[in-house]
Amino acid sequence: MDSYQEEEPVASTSGLQDLQTLSELVGPENAGEGDLVIAEEPEENPRRPRRYTKRDVKCVSYHAYKELEDKHPHHIKLQDWIPKPEEMVAQKVQNQDVGTILSFDVTCLKSITSLGRNDPGNDPSIMSHVLPVVTPWPMSQDHYAPTLFGLLDRYYKGYLENPATFQTWKFTCQEDPSGKRYMGTQFWVPPLGQVNIQFYKNYQIVTCCQALDPFANIFHGTEEEMYDIDSGPDVWCTPSLCFKVIYEGAIGQKQEQKSWLCRLGYGHRMGANDYRRVDLYAMKQGKKNPYGDKGDAALQYAYQVKRGCKAGCLASPVLNFKALQFHRTLMADLTNPKIGQGYLAHGYHAAMEAYGPQRGSSEERVWWNATRNQGKKDEYYREGGEEPHYPNTPAPHKKTWEERHKVLKLSPFATPSDIQRWTTRALPYGWKVIDGNGDDYTSRRNIRTLTEMTQEEIRKRWERGYCDPFIDSGSDSDGPLSKPQTVKVW
């Protein structure tokens, strides 16, 4: 198992001595201990093209949510929901070091990934702005503010639907197992799960347990059976879904922050293991079911996505890569949420297809080792061995995953957007799919003739696996002149 002892020692960062300056913009002239300093822009060289400087790439993720606040002056404000610096001073909030924070979950800590574009290493996932973990909307790995604003945005939408059971985040002063004081709160955000936020003077910590869901993942057995992993709910705490992200810096820091992604396993703190069956039923009391009928994106994520990504037998770099593929597919649709936005995507079918097999596959493992994405020493499967019920070895005489999933089959939880996309991709032009409600979806597939195709399109046909770019699929039904047919999906 990956543990924090295997990581390079991290220097302790004591925060600002005077928290009164936390709300000010930190610059080279007034930066305190523990703050990141923005480098000054170098002078322009007229003989060379201008390159991006540190000032250009900094503050990108922080302003992702600031732009939203400026566009909606009467909307919610993040600073109205998080503790004020003066309040943290009054409560005597203390500094903490990252090694001590990691030690709290050492028994359930599956891996630690140091994130940041300036972080040394050969893991490409650390270079992204998106936090490499499967979530309903993308979170930021560069700054805590967009991540919290996305959570607040989604939480506030639930408040508008059912104001009697929602309230402002209540931050209270608490002590961690080492005795250090911090400001913390926790709340449940569907379909994500249970969220816990901690503010130290020099760190912000967000812990998320996606296995905690009293509406979509509750177990109806006995109290003893509930804590048995062999007979528990469908989704238990797994390193592919449960995580803790640690942001380094003061609460008022505007610059890009250093962060660590910790993947948590079964039995982690602030997770589903801390809740008894009676607690889950109590969480449902007085709350409106946040999930709609089949076709609702929230229901699709709570049931299909979590059950399709729960296996934790793969190594952390592989899970990071698959999670980024998941978010990349979602963000390719510009109408889906971006960093700093907390609404749901139109559908997660395409993202699940991009995520691939949750337990891995032979061809994916061969590709991973052949491309050497993580170097020769890094493995495809988790170093700590197999997780329960998630074997590393594929069944013998079984077709490869690619052969069985040329087009990922439709799920009963697919949204209308997913059905339309699947119909256009899987069925000939003019064919229809009719769902249980009587709504029909017509395939828009169109095959262009050779005279209309460019050299770039011909090359792409080669890359997609066509043996000859000048030959169609061999079916007369792949064009506008085909005879439409209807397929019923119930």
From Swiss-Prot:
One of its GO terms (biological process) is positive regulation of DNA-templated transcription. Bet interacts with host APOBEC3C; this interaction does not induce APOBEC3C degradation, but prevents dimerization and incorporation into virion of the latter. Keywords: Host cytoplasm, Host nucleus, Host-virus interaction, Secreted. Transmembrane segments: none annotated. One of its GO terms (cellular component) is extracellular region. Bet counteracts the innate antiretroviral activity of APOBEC3 family defense factors by inhibiting their incorporation into virions. May be implicated in the establishment and/or maintenance of viral persistance. Bet is required for viral replication. It holds the Pfam family Foamy_BEL. It comes from the Viruses. Residues 11-20 have a biased composition (Polar residues). The keyword Secreted applies. InterPro entries: Foamy_BEL. This is Protein Bet. Residues 1-20, 25-52, 471-490 are annotated as: Disordered.
